[in-house]
Amino acid sequence: MKLKSVHHIAVICSDYEKSKAFYTEVLGMEVLAEHYRAERDSYKTDLALNGNYIVELFSFPHPPPRPTGPEAAGLRHLAFAVDDINVCVRELETKGVAHEDVRVEPFTGCRFVFFKDPDGLPIEFYAC
């Protein structure tokens, strides 16, 4: 078996409009397709980063909360490569998004910062 690449990442949200606004207005993703599924009372929306499909955003009525803590089993966080951490941090701040302090990865010297989506999923910006 030979994997080619990561095709997409599926994210389930508890408040569709809030999460859609976060991923599009804060992170700058574009909506490729948006479908309301009446039989499930849910949305399925495909989001692109730089024109490439990357995130599949789902809403479901009353989803269970995310496990607490970043060290819970399963997906730990989403990481996005950026050119300039300082510019990204300033933009997060102007949009009212709380974030951790910028840190330096000791093995590579790369800089990174964590913040959370509306449902508490950790997101990382990473710059080398």
Predicted regions and their residues:
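A short, acidic/glycine-rich surface segment
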Residues: 32-34, 40-43, 62-68, 101
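Exposed loop/turn and edge beta-strand positions of beta-sandwich/beta-sheet ligand-binding modules
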Residues: 5, 41-43, 74, 109
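N-terminal beta-strand motif that seeds the catalytic metal site of vicinal oxygen chelate
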Residues: 1-17, 75-78
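Short amphipathic alpha-helices within nucleic acid-binding modules
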Residues: 22, 86-91
